[in-house]
Structure formats: C-alpha cells, structure tokens
Amino acid sequence: MLSLSKNWNTLIKPNKVAYENFPETNNKAKIVVEPLERGFGLTLGNAMRRVLLSSLQGAAITSIKIPAIEHEFSSIPGVKEDVSEVILNIKGIEVKMHVAEKRIMKLKATGPCVVTAGMIETGHDVEILNPDHVICDLAKDKQLEMELTCKVGKGYVLSTNSYEDNLPIGEIAIDALFNPVKSVTYKVENTRVGQVTDYDKLIMFVETNGDVLPEMAVGLAARILQEQLQLFISFEEQEEDKQVKTDTLPFSPYLLKRVDELELSVRSANCLKNDNIIYIGDLVKRTESDMLRTPNFGRKSLNEIKEILAKFNLRFGMDVPDWPPENIQELSKRYEDSYN
C-alpha cells in the first residue's frame, strides 16, 4: 500500500520566511516565503489575504452619545459638520484595547479648535492609534461633549446589525471596522532550488493600523487556517509514517542532501559536479584549500558555498565519522523528510 505521508512529504516545503519592515513605519511589512511547489504561491497567498482582511480580532468604536442629540440626522450647535459627517469621521479613529470588556471614552473640547482623536480621554485600557485624525471643527466659545463606546470584535459590523439591540435613548450605533489589517496585496514569482527554477516565491505586502504588527497578523492568519483545516484530516497515519528513523546515524541527516538541491550558481554547481561532489557530506569534508584547487572554482564560489553552509551550522573541513556510508543512496532517500 502506498504510504499516505508520501502525499505531503514528497512536496517541497518552504524553508525561508523573511520579514522586511518599511523604514517609515513598523505597520507595513514585506513578507517573502520560499520555496513553494508550483501553484502553491497563489493558493496560499489568496487564502492568507482573505483571512487577514476578514477574521482577525481588533477594536473599534461602536456607538456615541452626544447630549441633546438623538439621531444622526441632527446638527450640533457650534460644530461645522452635521452628525452624519462627525460619525463618518469617528469611524476612521483607530483604537487598540488591552482588555476584552467594553470601555467608554469621553471627549470634551472648547472652541475655537479642530477636534482630533487625540483629545479623547481613553484611560489606561485603550489607546488611540491615530491621534491626529480630525473629528470636527468647533466654533469659538462653543463646547462639545461626547461619550464613545469601544469594543473588541472582528470584521465589519454595520450599525443596523449591531449586537447592541437596546441602546439607551440618545446613544447612536455606528458601523464598526474591527479588523486591524488595513491592506494586503501579494504576488508570486519564480524561485530556484538546485537546478530547478520554476518553484514559487510568495511575496506579501501587509499594512496594519498598529494594533498588531504585520508579522503577528500573518502568524494569526496562518493559525486560523490551520485550525479550520484540521477537521478535514479524517485518517490516521500509518505507523511507518510516524516513525522518524534518526537514531542510527552518526552524523546529521542533512549531510545526505544532494548538493544539486542547494541554491548554487550554475558555475559553482558545475564545479562540484565535475569534482564528483554529490552530497553535502562530500562537500563539508573538503577543506577550503581543496576546493580552491578544483578547476574553475574561485574565491567567489567558495564564499557563496560557505554562506549557504553557515545557515545550517556547517563549514568546510569538518570531521564526519563513517562517511560515506555504504548504502548512501538508500539513506538519502529514507531521510529526505528530515532535511527538506
């Protein structure tokens, strides 16, 4: 019977996730994942994007209360904007909550002034992430008082679908955007593994409002997908699939990996092939001097390989006991899941 684990263990797995923040802010990041099987870049990119934009928990203002104002079609004395415009501006306030329970914030201002989100009294449990955000213009000698209710939730909740069924008279429900992720885009490019150049590289650009960092948002989205997909695994692995046979080797199974699977330049790969260096174990037993005596192998190729080996705590001139093993091809195939 075909081993079930062959369905996933024979696929190439991403071994590199790079996060790069933009210099002007920590709220934007470029995330690069590689290598992926061809087609998996689009599959994972689309799934991650949808989860990032819909399913993460965040905080938002869900209702406001202004003295003597009972609905959004009113006007506020001394305020240039009507209540509908004020509500629209309040929807743009980005908040972060440190507790799960709702909190009521207060705003008091005296004109003339431009009322901003930074004037809101939040207490210790809530932060305003965009304090310069404009709420309204207040005329001279006029006062504005307001209570704003802040809650934790997910997605986009319309005021008409608010879970606050019985708001007190004078309290106005507003649309709430809880999601801390503001935008997600992605693209897929080719990447190279060994001599194969058409694997996928997934590049995502994620921007948040500062409630969570992009790296954390991506991790949360991946965990959500993992939890949702777990139910579909309706079989048990065979015992042979569960066994990890690593107790008989006197060296790291990574040394059984073929050098043509490394991301080497064509020149370096050809030099190793011509010198009959097939496995990483063959490679690390050579000294730097040995390598520089290889025809057409120069200092640039040496530094390229040293950099790759260093990622796995390997180096030239290593003492590898019992290398090469007699059944090296069989061992390489058996342990391929350990080093991929």
Curated annotation (Swiss-Prot):
GO CC list: cytoplasm; DNA-directed RNA polymerase complex
Enzymatic reactions: RNA(n) + a ribonucleoside 5'-triphosphate = RNA(n+1) + diphosphate
Region (Alpha N-terminal domain (alpha-NTD)): 1-236
GO biological process, alphabetically ordered: DNA-templated transcription
Protein name: DNA-directed RNA polymerase subunit alpha
Key word Secreted present: no
Family per similarity comment: Belongs to the RNA polymerase alpha chain family.
Subunit structure, interactors included: Homodimer. The RNAP catalytic core consists of 2 alpha, 1 beta, 1 beta' and 1 omega subunit. When a sigma factor is associated with the core the holoenzyme is formed, which can initiate transcription.
